[in-house]
Amino acid sequence: MALTFTEKKRLRKNFGRISSIIDIPNLISVQKESFVRFLQTGTEFEKMKDTGLHGVFLSVFPIHDYAGTVSLEYVSYALGEPKYDVDECLQRGMTFSAPLKVAFRLVIWDENEETGTKTVREIKEQDVYLGEIPLMTNTGTFIINGTERVIVSQMHRSPGVFFDHDRGKTHSSGKLLFSARVIPYRGSWLDFEFDPKDLLFARIDRRRKLPVTTLLRAMGMSSEQILERFYEIETFRKEGVVWQKRMVPERLMGNRLNYAIVHPESGEEIVKAKKRVTARHIKKFEELGMDWLPVSQEELIGSFVARNMSDVMGEVVIEAGAEITEEMVQYLEDGGIKEIDVLFIDGMSVGAYLRNTLALDKNSGQDEALIDIYRMMRPGEPPTVDAAKALFNNLFFNSDRYDLSTVGRLKMNSRLSLNTELHIRTLQHDDILGVVDILLKLKDGHGKVDDIDHLGNRRVRSVGELLENQVRIGLVRMERAIRERMSSAEADQLVPHDVMNSKPFSAVIREFFGSSQLSQFMDQTNPLSEITHKRRLSALGPGGMTRERAGFEVRDVHPTHYGRICPIETPEGPNIGLINSLSTYARINEFGFIESPYRQVKEGTPIDQVDFLSAIDEENYIIAQANAKLGDEASEEDALIQCRHKLEFMVATPDRVNYQDVSPKQTVSVAASLIPFLENDDANRALMGSNMQRQAVPLIKTDAPLVGTGIESVVARDSGVTITARRTGVVDEVDAARIVVKADEEPGSTEPGVDIYNLTKFSRSNQNTCINQVPLVKNGERVTAGDIIADGPSTQIGELALGRNVLVAFMPWNGYNFEDSILISERLVAEDVFTSIHIDEFEVMARDTKLGAEEITRDMPNVGEDALRNLDESGIIYVGAEVKPGDILVGKVTPKGETQLTPEEKLLRAIFGEKASDVRDTSLRLPPGVAGTVVDVRVFSRRGLEKDDRAKLIDQDEIALLRKDMAAERRIIERDADERIRNLMNGKPVRSAPGLQPGDHISQSWLDKSPSSHLRDVVLDDDAITQQIEGIRHHVEKAADRLKKRFESKVEKLERGDDLPPGVLKMVKVYIAVKRKLQPGDKMAGRHGNKGVISKINPLEDMPYMANGTPVDIVLNPLGVPSRMNVGQILETHLGWAARGMGFKIEEALKQHRKGVADVLRRQFEEIYDNTRESAEIAALSDDQLVDMAKNLQYGVPTATPVFDGAIESDISSWLNKAGLPTSGQIQLIDGRTGEPFDRHVTVGYIYMLKLHHLVDDKIHARSIGPYSLVTQQPLGGKAQFGGQRFGEMEVWALEAYGAAYTLQEMLTVKSDDVAGRTKIYESIVKGDDTFEAGVPESFNVLVKELQALALDVTLQRDD
């Protein structure tokens, strides 16, 4: 495979030994494919499947009125164009959505009262607007009210039937009580369970239990039918004085009988009493032709009658299921009945559970059973047979009320061995009988119960399906209202629009996207956190579990997770195991089950055919691991191979293997597969490592890891933060905000031959980090479709770059790295190595209040001129102003109510005028802890109101920018068209042209000096080319028209004003960029779960340094490694050092190359990239490309050590050796303070360190006075509320122990909730007096009031 554009700039040296069979699938396809399935975009209406939005409409409609004379039918639906594009929605706080219009048909019927037939009287068809459907962006997110959100996929229990037991916990004897549960997609749950007496009961929706036979009778089965369905029948007959039973050899096999078996004629004893019946005995029975076996009468007594037995008159005298007694046998003999059918129940392989349940059941017929079920479901309502029948039918057999779903039917069929059609999604009688059958067999010891945590029993509901369920809820809410409107009004005058109220529909959609537990604010800290959020699987949410109820089994790793769900990446804390991540190669199939890819193995040799298997399919195969040596690679030592089969590990010979893993990283998620040497880390630390990579803040200067895993480029590409080329071509124009690629011309094509890519510049992410895109290409460079042409945040040359490569020493340093603290060099701060930019958004609204409108103004009461220096005439801060805490960003005044004025105030008003007193200053000020530069201001004014000067100015700038963009895009398209037209005309004969004779050929020189306007006057001889030129011109006109319309639409939206929340007149948003340098208290981490807090920034000259004078950047504590068992960081240190050393070698070679020494650079590259694929690609590069790559590699050769297939010890040693570094990975360091060498050699190398989003600036907080709680009058808590520090119970004990009585008193009174005391102490401080007097704390008053609320009369007696 040829190198991509970015690989030609910088190629990773790969230490992996296993080549990949298939590429990693698109990492956000989980979201995108599900949403496409929901809308079925791009599918013709006639070819749409009955799923998604279309399927919901089909399932709810047609709706009939109560009389059955009017029906509303669904015809089709169409989505309109979104009103605002993605960027506009983000800026204006709008939802990115498209209007949904549905065509409905209202049919009015005439009924012939005599014949009862219906004829159509009238049909009215109409498009009805149902509301807005949010659309998914190209990156798999939704823009809801201006914020980017992700709908997380939900893991839930698959519909179908599940068999289980209580593990002996219910009953004291430890007996296993078996149960079964039929779970539909929607509808009533049906449970079957045994009680401790071994009777079988059924429950509907977890209500009171009923004997299972009541349910079977309600289905129309008689006692005889029930027994016949679940039991085999034995026949006894009386021959003379001896009872005989029909011989069934299978039933006798292995049994010991209490009596001997004797041949009836010869009297030969075939089996002795108390001896086991063997296969030899059975063979002898067949040889002797014994069909009947003589038995004693005792064997018959205690059996159960299989069928009803009637007397001569036809009256039933013995009912099916009755126990046979001696009297009954005598009665039958007296009645001349010589043959009797009994149930085969031997108490060992078949138990009498169902027969005993039948005996317990008081109901005798179907009607009684139905009424019993009705009473249980609707207690207190008078039952009738018809109502009971309707209720029972609606519970399980009506498709409107009960839906197993296709998945449920599939699972039902496979578990019960049925062949019911998949479109039959209600319960069938066979399903219920099949469930009871398997339950009885389980009780008899046949078969196994299901494992609820098996991924064959859990499925994923992605965006499309979750949205489909919400749409159904909305339509069902509308259904009742539609039916009532159709019934009440005059049907003749109705049109579809009249009967529909779309409010419930749009409310449900809005509620789902806005407040559902699964609709989450996207984690946009860095590209990895975005991807992980979209690939997340949650077991929580509506219809899922709750944290409190989830036990260990649900959270645990299950063998079926292999290749489907990552065993490493899950949150720490209460959600552990409930929130998971999809594995790298996993995909979700149409039924919602997770599939993993496997490579086929035929006769011991792997072939290039890859199949995706679900957890259920996988169990039937023997699967080898990715590193198994099969086929040509196998040696004699590989006669037995480690495999997986039926959830267990085993060894097998190569010829028995069916499949092989496609890659070693298919078991883990994206985040875990970014950790090099993952195989050398403890799982707990790997979990922390994968979680902390998602918290890494994008830095100003990005740096891809020297030690990577090879999938950094995949993450960068699929995350959507980079820009990829749509078509192959040559870069025509590049600046900071736009890239223009001139696409390769396809013969005969008239489409515009340019692609224009606009870059995002310094915009704010959800987590306040900075999103900025930077071009990677230069003019004239060639790019291929799919190449990365611009970097985004946390990416470098098309690879994920979350942190920086820094030189680390593992050694203690004066206690500054005690307990995971980190000592860093001043260089990291001075050179902005870990500096990041954060953009904070502050907004203020001017509302219409009862006392009048608030006003955004520069004219505020009691504010000095100095505070207004950065505000413009409208009272809004200038862009570019440096601001610090307390500065006014937007001036605002609010009217206040009239109050009684003191004489002094009256005097002041008389002197200084009215304005100052009737308004108060409610300006937006910068909160503590934020200081930076204003980078953007946006003013939104309510539609219809006059805009202020600043808003007009912003609009003018925006329009000027839009006009400039439109002109530039038009110029680019016209220039490209002009070039193509000139190329087509070159050398062609003309009929007429300015300055040419008919028949002359157009020359290049004529084209060079002719302006574009002359080309329009040229008439060519060749009509086909003329037509092609006209096509190109037509496309240019169309493109120009499209650009003009887009420009006009955007201008119109700007001038129109904004849709603001009710009561808001104006809204101003101010964006402030804050530069955050590294400082003590910031949290840093590596990729192996090695985290710590910066304790000290050490001067460069004090840091330990190497013999060549290079000081280390970071000193880490070596004690952080052994107990944590994350040795991966040490291996990374060694390999990182070697990679950096190789960079020095390339730097030397580059210097030699510049001096004109031929081939030295190429030889150096050949030494580094020594595996076959890479060396072939390097050999194909030109000298210029090689020099270009060398410039990027001189600071270190990036390596890839894929998870579970990475560099081994010998690789690292050999690389250290090649780089001219000690193979021990240790070196003599010198103390920067004393200049003396340390006693021992120290492990030194390059580690990839991340700066995490836990910055001390966001956490540090101080308060002197601030807000108080309304009820208790105690200070609020937390930085967000500007709260105080809690002085809790234990802190009180500490002060009591010290005997600090006065300190304690002020803590519990004036500093907390003594309202009067607070005021007094303020006054006394003002007077210069430092004494205070404590009053009654407000919390005491609260206690008194609470006691009074309990009707206890508590009064306060004062000792005066």
UniProtKB/Swiss-Prot annotation:
<dbReference type="GO" id="GO:0003899">
    <property type="term" value="F:DNA-directed RNA polymerase activity"/>
</dbReference>
<dbReference type="GO" id="GO:0000428">
    <property type="term" value="C:DNA-directed RNA polymerase complex"/>
</dbReference>
<dbReference type="InterPro" id="IPR015712">
    <property type="entry name" value="DNA-dir_RNA_pol_su2"/>
</dbReference>
<comment type="similarity">
    <text>Belongs to the RNA polymerase beta chain family.</text>
</comment>
<comment type="function">
    <text>DNA-dependent RNA polymerase catalyzes the transcription of DNA into RNA using the four ribonucleoside triphosphates as substrates.</text>
</comment>
<comment type="subunit">
    <text>The RNAP catalytic core consists of 2 alpha, 1 beta, 1 beta' and 1 omega subunit. When a sigma factor is associated with the core the holoenzyme is formed, which can initiate transcription.</text>
</comment>
<keyword id="KW-0548">Nucleotidyltransferase</keyword>
<dbReference type="Pfam" id="PF04561">
    <property type="entry name" value="RNA_pol_Rpb2_2"/>
</dbReference>
<dbReference type="InterPro" id="IPR037033">
    <property type="entry name" value="DNA-dir_RNAP_su2_hyb_sf"/>
</dbReference>
<dbReference type="InterPro" id="IPR037034">
    <property type="entry name" value="RNA_pol_Rpb2_2_sf"/>
</dbReference>
<dbReference type="GO" id="GO:0003677">
    <property type="term" value="F:DNA binding"/>
</dbReference>
<dbReference type="Pfam" id="PF04560">
    <property type="entry name" value="RNA_pol_Rpb2_7"/>
</dbReference>
<dbReference type="InterPro" id="IPR019462">
    <property type="entry name" value="DNA-dir_RNA_pol_bsu_external_1"/>
</dbReference>
<dbReference type="GO" id="GO:0006351">
    <property type="term" value="P:DNA-templated transcription"/>
</dbReference>
<dbReference type="InterPro" id="IPR007120">
    <property type="entry name" value="DNA-dir_RNAP_su2_dom"/>
</dbReference>
<keyword id="KW-0804">Transcription</keyword>
<dbReference type="Pfam" id="PF00562">
    <property type="entry name" value="RNA_pol_Rpb2_6"/>
</dbReference>
<dbReference type="InterPro" id="IPR007642">
    <property type="entry name" value="RNA_pol_Rpb2_2"/>
</dbReference>
<protein>
    <recommendedName>
        <fullName>DNA-directed RNA polymerase subunit beta</fullName>
        <ecNumber>2.7.7.6</ecNumber>
    </recommendedName>
</protein>
<dbReference type="InterPro" id="IPR010243">
    <property type="entry name" value="RNA_pol_bsu_bac"/>
</dbReference>
<dbReference type="InterPro" id="IPR007121">
    <property type="entry name" value="RNA_pol_bsu_CS"/>
</dbReference>
<dbReference type="Pfam" id="PF10385">
    <property type="entry name" value="RNA_pol_Rpb2_45"/>
</dbReference>
<keyword id="KW-0808">Transferase</keyword>
<dbReference type="InterPro" id="IPR007645">
    <property type="entry name" value="RNA_pol_Rpb2_3"/>
</dbReference>
<dbReference type="InterPro" id="IPR014724">
    <property type="entry name" value="RNA_pol_RPB2_OB-fold"/>
</dbReference>
<dbReference type="InterPro" id="IPR007641">
    <property type="entry name" value="RNA_pol_Rpb2_7"/>
</dbReference>
<dbReference type="InterPro" id="IPR007644">
    <property type="entry name" value="RNA_pol_bsu_protrusion"/>
</dbReference>
<dbReference type="Pfam" id="PF04565">
    <property type="entry name" value="RNA_pol_Rpb2_3"/>
</dbReference>
<dbReference type="InterPro" id="IPR042107">
    <property type="entry name" value="DNA-dir_RNA_pol_bsu_ext_1_sf"/>
</dbReference>
<dbReference type="GO" id="GO:0032549">
    <property type="term" value="F:ribonucleoside binding"/>
</dbReference>
<dbReference type="Pfam" id="PF04563">
    <property type="entry name" value="RNA_pol_Rpb2_1"/>
</dbReference>
<keyword id="KW-0240">DNA-directed RNA polymerase</keyword>
